[in-house]
Amino acid sequence: PTALTLAHNNDSYAQEIHHYFHRKSFRVYYSNDFIGVQLAGAMKNVIAIAVGVSDGLGFGANARAALITRGLKEMQKLGSAFSAKEKTFMGLTGLGDLLLTATDNQSRNRRFGLALGEGISSVDAINKIGQVVEGRFNAEQICSLGKKKQIELPICHIVSQIIAEKITATDAVNFLLDRPATYE
């Protein structure tokens, strides 16, 4: 079985369409948070790359959980700046898809991050995967949106730097760990 979210800014239309697809083993939920669904869908790719990098460097479950949790916080912060609904980021579109994409070895974004964490160049990692890695493109776009809204997105920023080969994966970890502690 699987589940997904269908987003449309017209509630009645989304409700109507969802009935065409919704089945016992294919659960379709609907949302009118069109912006939140789009942002969550793009940002989870970037966070999944970060988690892959961490795992590629040999870090364990604690680092993975921290990146997923703090990454979700970045998703919520940017979403809030664009008037997205917080509940979108706590549902299938946000947390659900983030958990799947960041932890499943079938995920292209996770595998890309794993390769980067193992020291493979961006180009070689893409060639190794042989498929489109959306997070590769999403990272810079997300950083631009954050900058436009004056929102600090350290995980997204560092992932874009690793992809552009402006910083090594090891230096990226040090950058994140050297940041001052903040109130959660």
Walk through the language-model features, giving the residues of each.
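Internal alpha-helical scaffold of NAD(P)-dependent oxidoreductase catalytic cores
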Residues: 1-88
